[in-house]
Every structure is written in structure tokens, then in C-alpha cells.
Amino acid sequence: QLQRVYGTSFESKKDLEQYLFQLEEAKRRDHRKLGPELGLYRFEDVAPGFAFWLDKGYRLYRELENWSRKLQEARGYEEVSTPWIVSSKLYETSGHWQHYRHNMFEIRSEDQDFATKPMNCPCHCVLYKSQIRSYRDLPLKIAEYGPLSRFEASGTLHGLLRVRGFHQDDAHLFVR
């Protein structure tokens, strides 16, 4: 039977003490501990990998989103909102279905395959090609704030850093 052994060495006792101090600081400042303690968000067993945002945390989230919106608006972005459940045909066309399907939440309804949206790119391309445009209309700057979901393996979930559901500030530029 094999057993893995980890070792760490330091040039001096001072370096070791600094390392141990940093480990303790990291534990003290861990967002997985601070978020619930500060009343910002929680994770519950009924929805693994999806945050339940509490009032203070969601207020903070909205403040950041509004700040970002102002920046994008000043730079000429148009804000859009696209469906968060989309036909698998779109993802087959974009290539995501073949390469990313194992990370998507699939839904079967009325004999059709759908998936929750893991990224905005294909939907933004649908919006772009929905009308004839002149090169004079470019660049087209599209921004979206919306929910996305990705099926991350349970062993990879890590607080807010690796989740299954999140809101993303996403933008695409269509240029000539």
C-alpha cells in the first residue's frame, strides 16, 4: 500500500513562524467563514454549490453591479438579458454541447433537450445575427448581468470561488 507524505522546509525558524502566521491569517480571513458570520450569504444542503444571498450580502452585490453598470454605460455598452434555459441546438451549433455538456445542467421537456445557460456567448451571438447590420453599426458592445450555472463536481466546490450557480457581469464586442 502506498502512502503519500508531504513535507515542508524553511531556511530559518523565522520563515517557519511567518508561514504558520500566514496559515492562521488565511483561516481567520476565509470567506467561507466570514460570509455567514457577517450575514452576507449561506450555503445549504438543499442546493449544493448555490449561494443563498442574505439582505446585507445582496445589497453589497447590487452596489457592485450598479457601479459596474455605470462604467459600462459610460463606455457605450448596451445591456441585454437573454434566457437562462436554452435549446441544446444552440450549444450544438456553437460547439459547447460536444465539449462542455458534462458541465451543463440538462433539461428534457416536450421531447426537446435544453440546458441552463453556463455562459452568455452563444446567446449574444444569436442577438447579433438577429438583424442585418452595416459596418457603420459596429462596434456593437453588449453587456449582460445574469444568472449562469455550471455543473461542477461536488469535490471541486469551494465557497464562492467555485460554485454551480452565479451571476456574471459579461460583455461581448462585435467589431469590424
Label the model's feature ranges.
Residues 1-157, 161, 173:
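Auxiliary tRNA-acceptor-end handling modules of aminoacyl-tRNA synthetases
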Residues 163-166:
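Short, flexible turn/loop "capping" segments at secondary-structure junctions
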Residues 168-170:
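Catalytic palm active-site di-aspartate
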